[in-house]
């Protein structure tokens, strides 16, 4: 978004950067490969925020990882995060409150940054480092809708 906003003449509004990987890994090896691909694409560029393992349903509901159970999904998240850490970046996990509560074992994720998506509430219902509170915000000069995220990382 930073480059998009800058190109629309709105100035350097967004300064901190991080990335996420919409994971379709179905095992730990694939999760590590996804982490390696993220770092490869960065080509040495440093980030302010973590590299997040994004786990959520695919748009059509038929993604490779959609049917993973809690144990396997959590193993993939941990493998991704540990690989990101080994490659010199901060690791994190992105999911909705429902996914954190029902599709991941949060007790295994305490060493990683948590980015929680939960809309139409005053604050995140789970402890997190970043909270995505809406996906329908608008900013002047941009014709579409954007996500709004609140960082508690300082």
Question: Model-predicted segments: where are they?
Answer:
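Short amphipathic alpha-helical segments and helix-helix/interface helices
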Residues: 12, 78-81, 106
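Single conserved hydrophobic/aromatic residue that forms the stacking wall/gate
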Residues: 1-14
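Aromatic-lined carbohydrate-recognition surfaces of secreted/lumenal glycan-active proteins
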Residues: 84, 88-101
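Acidic-and-aromatic substrate-binding clefts and catalytic sites of carbohydrate-active enzymes
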Residues: 24-33, 98-102
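Functionally critical loop-and-helix segments that line ligand-binding/catalytic clefts
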Residues: 100, 105-154
């Amino acid at each position: 978004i930073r480059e998009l906003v800058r190109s629309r003449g709105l100035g350097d509004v967004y300064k901190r950067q991080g990335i996420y990987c919409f994971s379709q890994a179905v095992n730990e090896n694939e999760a590590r490969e996804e982490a390696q691909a993220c770092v490869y694409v960065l080509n040495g560029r440093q980030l302010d925020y973590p590299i997040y393992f994004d786990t959520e349903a695919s748009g059509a509901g038929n993604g490779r990882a959609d049917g993973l159970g809690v144990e396997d999904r959590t193993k993939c998240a941990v493998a991704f995060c540990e690989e990101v850490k080994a490659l010199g970046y901060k690791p994190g996990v992105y999911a909705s409150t429902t996914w954190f509560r029902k599709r991941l074992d949060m007790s295994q994720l305490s060493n990683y940054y948590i980015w929680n998506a939960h809309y139409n509430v005053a604050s995140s219902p789970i402890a997190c480092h970043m909270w995505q509170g809406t996906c329908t915000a608008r900013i002047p000069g941009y014709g579409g809708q954007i996500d709004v995220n609140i960082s508690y990382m300082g």
